[in-house]
Regions:
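Surface loop/turn motifs at the tips and blade-to-blade linkers of beta-strand repeat domains
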Residues: 160-165, 172
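Disordered, low-complexity "stalk" and linker segments at domain junctions of extracellular
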Residues: 1-135, 141-143, 158
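Beta-propeller domains
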Residues: 140-160
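Conserved catalytic-core segments centered on acid/base and nucleophilic motifs
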Residues: 40, 44, 169-176
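Conserved positions at the start
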Residues: 127, 134, 166-168, 175
Length: 176
């Protein structure tokens, strides 16, 4: 069968967290951000601290120094992390979190310091065989071996795989 989580024999928990389905609707409020174009990014975060991959907006012009988001997605047992880029769309830095369907932020650019560590990641794929090697989870999907991000078993990068000529029938990590 397909492997997509962990269990202690009594309960189970999915390995990956599905990213938010939508970005909500941006609006402007007064604040202290430099005037310019920004992007915002959303992730879901579980109570255990695991965070989904980020979904990103297109450029949003902020003329009044603040950002308001309405119609945000919600998920039971998760908070929504809101990240904001620097002026003109570079990076993604934590602006705050919410458990409601709206969020407002009007702080300074210098307040945006904690980077989004899941930007560019994707949920870890589901596979039939799995292994653990040097802080990474390995999983086989037919003839492709995927690796998680180091010390982030719930995330992977779209380019972090190895394709083999035939179907994978076991995953057995070996150290030299």
């Amino acid at each position: 069968g397909m492997i997509h989580g962990v269990t202690d024999g009594l309960t189970n928990q999915e390995r990956s967290i599905t990213p938010p389905e939508s970005l909500g609707a941006p609006g402007m409020v007064f604040g202290q951000l430099d005037h310019g174009q920004y992007r915002y990014h959303l992730t879901f975060r579980r109570a255990d601290g695991m965070e989904s991959s980020a979904v990103s907006s297109g450029p949003v012009m902020l003329n009044h120094g603040g950002l308001r988001l309405d119609g945000l997605p919600a998920r039971i047992g998760h908070s929504l992390q809101v990240y904001l880029s620097g002026k003109d769309g570079e990076g993604a830095y934590l602006a705050g979190e919410t458990t409601t369907d709206s969020f407002e932020w009007g702080g300074k650019n210098s307040d945006l310091v904690l980077p989004c560590r899941t930007l560019g990641a994707r949920p870890f794929p589901v596979g039939t065989y799995t292994g653990f090697w040097r802080g990474r989870v390995l999983v086989a999907q037919d003839n492709v071996l995927w690796a998680s991000r180091a010390n982030a078993p719930h995330l992977s990068d779209w380019r972090d795989f190895k394709q083999f000529p035939s179907r994978i029938t076991a995953v057995q990590p070996v150290d030299d």
